[in-house]
From Swiss-Prot:
GO terms for molecular function: heparin binding; identical protein binding; lipase binding; lipid binding; lipoprotein lipase activator activity; phospholipid binding. SMART domains: CCP. The gene is APOH. It comes from the Eukaryota. Residues 263-345 are annotated as: Sushi-like. Pfam families: Sushi, Sushi_2. Keywords: Disulfide bond, Glycoprotein, Heparin-binding, Repeat, Secreted, Signal, Sushi. Disulfide bonds join C23-C66, C51-C79, C84-C124, C110-C137, C142-C188, C174-C200, C205-C248, C234-C260, C264-C315, C300-C325, C307-C345. Residues 21-81, 82-139, 140-202, 203-262 form the Sushi domain. It comes from Homo sapiens (Human). Its main location: secreted. GO terms for biological process: blood coagulation, intrinsic pathway; chylomicron remodeling; negative regulation of angiogenesis; negative regulation of blood coagulation; negative regulation of endothelial cell migration; negative regulation of endothelial cell proliferation; negative regulation of fibrinolysis; negative regulation of myeloid cell apoptotic process. This is Beta-2-glycoprotein 1. N- and O-glycosylated. PubMed:6587378 also reports glycosylation on 'Asn-188' for their allele. Residues 1-19 form the signal peptide.
Amino acid sequence: MISPVLILFSSFLCHVAIAGRTCPKPDDLPFSTVVPLKTFYEPGEEITYSCKPGYVSRGGMRKFICPLTGLWPINTLKCTPRVCPFAGILENGAVRYTTFEYPNTISFSCNTGFYLNGADSAKCTEEGKWSPELPVCAPIICPPPSIPTFATLRVYKPSAGNNSLYRDTAVFECLPQHAMFGNDTITCTTHGNWTKLPECREVKCPFPSRPDNGFVNYPAKPTLYYKDKATFGCHDGYSLDGPEEIECTKLGNWSAMPSCKASCKVPVKKATVVYQGERVKIQEKFKNGMLHGDKVSFFCKNKEKKCSYTEDAQCIDGTIEVPKCFKEHSSLAFWKTDASDVKPC
């Protein structure tokens, strides 16, 4: 028979053993907290898991009681990041991102010609919302351009009310007697301003000089200005070396200064020559002389090869040198063939 004392002692030991099985500190779960958090728990004590701000639970238990065994049950709770709504398509711009989960950030940029009206980035918050609010890409606008002194707007078509959009242009022209320095066309830039304005300046030119053996005509007024014109001519026996008409330039000088050059008397009585790609009789074509600058090609014979070739001669201010190889054909030597009728080399 078992002693009552032994039974009482055994019961005491059993109670002490069971009562001493405390639960350890619970396992850490990603993105979660435990309340209360202690190093050990007595049997019967309760703990509660909760997800940290910005995270939500996806299955699993949240509350546990320390059992008499001192072993916590397996916890299957999962805390996952909140997901912010799709940021959408940024019209006239782009959105750069990796995910829409907390606490990620997305960034924004606009196409050329547009600017960000709002922040250049937004963060997915603990509440699953974007902060700050998503921006928009607004068009870059330039105000009406300033008009330079002594200038007028020749072309200007604002495309945004009275304002202009990126890459719009405006074209200026100067008032009469004024020259433009700089580009006549300005452009609306990405900074919302215009490219550099041109400058209009009054420009005067001196009266052109009369050429020797010639004359000059220009407007009968006290002063000649930018774009004014003068015309030149030569007396008989002279030809103009340069343009017939010149113009006052923006630099305050004339575009050219022609002169009168003497004509040349043809030094041969009879010959077939090439003038401007055609065969002509020099005694007929230039019976009144050759003008300064005129060029002809004389025919010469190569006696060894029995063929012909040409050499050039040009009238320069009253003088022309006939090629030494040229031999003027005599009508008396009818049996000889003129060089112009010999086959070319």
